[in-house]
């Protein structure tokens, strides 16, 4: 081979390597760096939780991620056929507002499974009830979590903020949204006089607000006759309503109460008592820190009006540890600063990397520890 030919081969090989680097999959890059960081701190292997459109569109390399040891659990799928498509693509679970529909699709897929391997995979499939399963009950309330458990969801997915007293309060927005919540005293409550979680104590939140409004669709019900466990638990806890904003530690107590309700309590003779108690006794909690990466938007309505990553970790992971839930809880976030801190400070608690637009998986939106080589 001539010197010029060798030089040419070397040149084009370098071009090929450079091109490959340019088109490297951002989800794979992120999880490889996240996996390295977790391993360095003896933390659990992180999980990728991408928006379902990036799974269905082929942007997320599901099989390649799984081959490297990373589970893939997309959000938020409510259409049965899209559920079925992703199940057949091999995802490890799905986050959904309609766990009832997902369970039906899974039942059909399990019945048609051809191999033991496929049956085993489907038996492990994670049914994660988004905000408790808001398609059936007012979101992120005790009745929604009860409904999620009634549907035999294997995970309760929810959101958290931090109150003035450092409590991990459960709510999706950084403020108590008037679309879902009303004031218990009947006073007007709108977007204009909204209350941010960082500006109220957990006790005052439970005295002031009732979040029983329905607005998600015709199947979302706020009929308390459908939520006997939440009603009994609210009475036990001295709450003004089962629909008051709840918090992480209280949710843990509620699920324990749910198990006891169906094992030895008022629901022990229910036709579904045994399966409900058994499922709830091992149900997991996927708790999001509602914090966005700094600089992701300059829109005042979407800026962070909450505490910083460390206070989120202190409140949420503190509640998880205090209640002995490290083996059943995970922390998820779009703000990877939170997840880095969890891996460093609470290595027994798994982390879920929430992703949307792949353009946000590079640059300043990603903590330095998780950036691919050469990324600024």
Segments predicted by a language model, with ranges:
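Phosphate-group recognition and catalysis centered on beta-loop-alpha active-site segments
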Residues: 19-376
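Bacterial N-terminal signal peptides
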Residues: 7-16
């Amino acid at each position: 081979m001539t010197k010029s030919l060798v030089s040419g081969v070397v040149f084009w090989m370098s071009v090929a390597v450079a091109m490959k680097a340019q088109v490297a999959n951002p989800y794979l890059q992120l999880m490889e760096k996240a996996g390295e960081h977790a391993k360095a701190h003896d933390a659990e292997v992180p999980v990728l939780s991408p928006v379902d459109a990036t799974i269905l569109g082929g942007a997320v390399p599901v099989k390649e991620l799984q081959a490297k040891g990373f589970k893939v659990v997309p959000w938020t799928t409510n259409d049965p056929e899209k559920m079925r498509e992703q199940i057949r693509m091999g995802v490890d679970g799905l986050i959904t507002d309609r766990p009832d529909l997902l369970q039906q699709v899974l039942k059909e897929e399990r019945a048609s499974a051809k191999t033991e391997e496929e049956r085993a995979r489907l038996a492990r499939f994670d049914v994660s009830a988004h905000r408790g399963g808001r398609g059936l009950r007012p979101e992120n309330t005790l009745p929604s979590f009860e409904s999620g458990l009634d549907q035999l969801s294997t995970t309760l997915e929810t959101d958290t903020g931090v109150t003035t007293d450092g409590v991990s309060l459960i709510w999706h927005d950084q403020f108590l949204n008037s679309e879902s919540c009303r004031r218990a005293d009947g006073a007007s409550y709108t977007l204009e006089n909204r209350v941010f979680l960082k500006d109220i104590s957990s006790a005052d939140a439970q005295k002031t607000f009732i979040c029983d409004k329905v607005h998600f669709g015709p199947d979302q019900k706020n009929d308390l006759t459908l939520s006997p466990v939440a009603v009994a638990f609210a009475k036990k806890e001295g709450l003004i309503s089962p629909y008051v904003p709840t918090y992480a530690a209280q949710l843990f107590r509620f699920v324990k109460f749910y198990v006891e309700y169906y094992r030895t309590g008022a629901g022990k003779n229910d036709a579904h008592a045994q399966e409900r108690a058994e499922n709830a006794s091992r149900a997991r909690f996927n708790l999001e820190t509602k914090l966005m990466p700094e600089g992701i938007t300059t829109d005042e309505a979407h800026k962070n009006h909450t505490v910083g990553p460390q206070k989120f970790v202190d409140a949420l992971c503190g509640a998880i540890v205090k209640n002995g839930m490290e083996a059943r809880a995970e922390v998820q976030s779009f703000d990877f600063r939170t997840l880095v801190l969890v891996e460093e400070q609470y290595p027994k608690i798994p982390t879920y990397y929430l992703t949307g637009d792949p353009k946000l998986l590079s640059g300043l939106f990603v903590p330095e520890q998780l950036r691919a080589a050469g990324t600024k």
